[in-house]
Amino acid sequence: MGNFQLEDFVAGWIGGAASVIVGHPLDTVKARLQAGSGYGSTLSCIRTVYRRESVFGFFKGMSFPLASIAVYNSVVFGVFSNTQRFLSHHRCQEPEAGPPHVLSDLLLASMVAGVVSVGLGAPVDLIEIRLQMQTQPFQEANLGLKPRVAALGEQPAYQGPVHCFATIVRTEGLAGLYRGASAMLLRDVPGYCLYFIPYVFLSDWITPEACAGPSPCAVWLAGGMAGAISWGTATPMDVVKSRLQADGVYVNKYRGVLDCMSQSYQKEGLKVFFRGITVNAVRGFPMSAAMFLGYELSLQAIRGDHVVTSP
């Protein structure tokens, strides 16, 4: 355990808080586009949310992820960095031997981080989605609701994150907190591979050989590009995850991942799995740029380094 470093978790917590503040407005738009109805496009969704709920509608449900996703990112970055460091040292047998970044080490560390992220993050993601979706416009024809049930969609189902948590546990049991977790696993394991690996190699590529480590500008650019790549490619399974997690606010439509994919394809065609891809990619850049920059600068401050150190 000599390679274990607690500061990776602390820096991940700081970076996670920064990413939530930067990315939550677009995250709300993404959730409405993917799991809601009545929005023709990204701009239409933004206008509708602003007109009906003002600017505060874009920050609906942010208090819970701000408190929890910071911890979530702390664990993800801490697990990734320590796993990658352990694998590298185990492979080389010498702490300072061998190249700092080997693809196989990064790949396995990313997969471990992805699995851990689902166990910790699925309930957080579920509550965030439910809070974001509870005031979205439901269309009676699309959902097949009776008029009385459809009318309930105009009133918020949850009074806040604590009430949302308690309601889900009471009505769906503890297993309800992990609704959509299988889709999240299929999204996050490859997603984190396409998150950490591009970041590491892009930051190394951008940084001149004479420099001891990447500059904050290089971290910002590499982190943003990695986020856009990861979130863009994760969109199809992100759509399925969002629909499964939003399912249950007013009505249950899906029996699982395959049923959700089948129903979505039959009703809306292949294009439905790419709904929100623009928002995902655009949102992924500033969120990930803030995440990696907050992480690296915090790590630099904690360790007293003069250069940024890649995970």
UniProtKB/Swiss-Prot annotation:
Q: How does it sit in the membrane?
A: Multi-pass membrane protein
Entries under Pfam families matching the protein: Mito_carr (PF00153)
Which SUPFAM superfamilies does UniProt cross-reference here? Answer: Mitochondrial carrier
Places the protein is found: Mitochondrion inner membrane
Q: Which GO terms describe its molecular function?
A: transmembrane transporter activity
UniProtKB keywords: Membrane, Mitochondrion, Mitochondrion inner membrane, Repeat, Transmembrane, Transmembrane helix, Transport
Q: What is this protein called?
A: Solute carrier family 25 member 48
Q: Name one GO cellular component term.
A: mitochondrion
Q: Which organism is it from?
A: Bos taurus
Q: Does the keyword Nucleotide-binding apply?
A: no
